[in-house]
Amino acid sequence: MKEQTFKNCFMLKSKIKTHKSGKMYNQPHFFILNKGLNSGKPFRHYVCNSFVFLADDKNERDFYYFMLQGIWELRLLRPYLKGTAIEFVRLGDVIDVLEEVLNSVNSGNRSFYDVQKALAQIELHQTNLQQQLSNLMQLRKALFYEYLRRK
């Protein structure tokens, strides 16, 4: 795969927007939760109270999705949470943290594409395990139902 540097930080401001309810997107995109303790967590599906990242292609979408997944898992946005009852993160803070991480990644010889496939495989396995767990819970309920409803 051709190596690209996604360092154009000024372009991030035009790619991350506040999602408006009911709006549909034709280009590759993902959502970033902006309220609660999970602020900054990326989602491939729509979530309420979110920003949307509008990518030019799937490679760019996947790159930024996994970058934000790493930022969320390392809790790099926690110091930027505002609010007392319901905490939230501002769009500008998300962009600033993402720019800082991109500058640090792009300054070294590390290639994100080296780990992107492994991260995608881990996500696939995690989804598979969640489905297996859901099936086991349904089986458990069915067994209880069969046992308790038997006359």
Language-model region placement:
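DNA target-recognition domains and sequence-specific DNA-contacting regions of bacterial/archaeal
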Residues: 1-102
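Amphipathic alpha-helical segments
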Residues: 64, 95-145
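Hydrophobic/aromatic-lined pockets within catalytic cores
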Residues: 148
